[in-house]
């Protein structure tokens, strides 16, 4: 909990003003679609901050649950509100990140959605050995064909747990370049090396 609180306040310092900007289109889009917006203040505020972080990382407001890929068409579908949201709301009652839900959802419903989301992103054990995190081999989201949790989420969690330096193994060049970009945004040094069957990124 302490680490989560520290991360929240760090993100608020970086993106608090941007989060207020996102409030406008989120509410407008929900009204237009007949959806509700997550009524739980902490997760809702975090989601706005994470969207702002995604925008700073990638130049677009991609869904905060997923790292964009090297597939441009898929990436367009990931721009929040993503093109998968309606299908998920029709099926489970809320979109994957829990930002939007059916119009009749209660705070208790959103709490259940949040618990499921946190189980995916914080309940999955990190493959971390001797300061090296292997991000490969995660569950693949059926609709998007993307790993959950992705490399960026795993790395942020690992840094919170063990700090720097951190070695990271990723499957693709795109993931490696994203980590290099994260390093630049967070005042870290990132070194990328291509291996035979994976990419290695050293963060310090």
Regions found by a protein language model. Give the residues of each.
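C-terminal edge-of-domain segments
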Residues: 184-204
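Short aromatic/hydrophobic contact patches that present stacked aromatics
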Residues: 140, 167, 200
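Residues in the short beta-alpha loop(s) of Rossmann-like NAD(P)-binding domains
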Residues: 103, 172-173
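Long, distal/terminal scaffolding or interaction modules
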Residues: 2-124
